[in-house]
Regions:
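Sequence-level detector for tyrosine residue identity
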Residues: 4, 12, 16, 120-121, ...
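Alpha-helical oligomerization segments
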Residues: 179-231
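Generic alpha-helical propensity signal that fires on short helical segments
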Residues: 33, 62, 159-161, 197-200, ...
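Alpha-helical context
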Residues: 108-109, 119, 155, 159, ...
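Amphipathic protein-protein interaction modules
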Residues: 139-196
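Extended, low-hydrophobicity segments enriched in charged/polar residues
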Residues: 1-157
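Sparse, context-dependent recognition of short Cys/His-centered cofactor- or disulfide-binding micro-motifs
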Residues: 5, 15, 52, 126-128, ...
Length: 231
């Protein structure tokens, strides 16, 4: 079936060209719940925070664009680069920027913001996913764990349940849409056929940008000097 690109250098549109006409790079929002203590750096977001965020909804979300402005960054690409030194920190030094990470974490501490977990859909994204799939007319989808393991069917409305976990890989039964978040990353890919995107445009549901012919997993790491994505 479908899979996430094998290498960072593989461009999204080329990788999926035989199945999809567009790829949208979507970001996970940060979460603001003032009445719950922040987790320590490197720890997963508490389950209780995920549950509360799903219950309270969009009011708990802070977009990467807003984080970029709070940090004084020039684009959300800098937010992505800063996030890569949280969690597992599986990134080579040349592609990271510790000063940006420190600045972002300082802002999150001052603003009482929970940093999104790598490799998982934010609770607010899970709500948006349910709306997105409903608009596409898919009451049931196939979900799978990382690398496409353990595929099974799941009802889209279950994405809304506070206690439910949405696996990292999702594709529709008619194979017109595929979504995936890689284990080390904080953003996810929304791949669609022309007909699918004519019914539900991901820009109406998620923060992010459409990939061009050069976009790959290096869009938000490294020097960022010539990168026009994630502006």
């Amino acid at each position: 079936m479908f899979s996430y690109p094998a290498n960072d250098e593989d461009t999204y549109l080329s990788w999926y060209k035989d199945s999809f006409s567009s790829v949208f790079v979507a970001t996970n929002p940060f979460i603001k719940i003032p009445d719950f203590p922040l987790n320590s750096q490197g720890e997963w977001m508490p389950d209780e925070v995920n549950t509360i965020a799903k219950q309270r909804g969009v009011e708990t979300g802070v977009t990467c664009r807003e984080i970029s402005e709070l940090c004084g960054f020039s684009s959300i690409a800098h937010v992505n680069r800063a996030l890569r030194l949280t969690g597992s920190k599986r990134i080579v030094n040349d592609l990271a920027c510790s000063s940006d990470t420190e600045k972002m974490l300082g802002v999150c501490k001052d603003q009482h913001l929970f940093v999104p977990d790598e490799g998982y859909y934010s609770p607010l994204v899970q709500i948006a996913l349910a709306r997105f799939l409903k608009q596409l007319g898919h009451d049931e989808v196939i979900v799978a764990d990382q690398f496409g393991t353990s595929p099974r069917q799941m009802r889209s409305e279950e994405f809304l349940l506070p206690e439910d976990f949405v696996p990292p890989e999702i594709y529709t039964l008619d194979k017109s849409a595929y979504l995936s978040i890689y284990t080390d990353y904080h953003y996810f890919l929304v791949c669609q056929s022309e007909r699918s995107i004519s019914v539900a445009n991901p820009m109406d549901y998620f923060e992010g940008f459409f990939a061009d012919e050069n976009t790959n997993d290096l869009w938000g790491v490294g020097s960022l000097g010539d990168n026009l994505n994630g502006n």
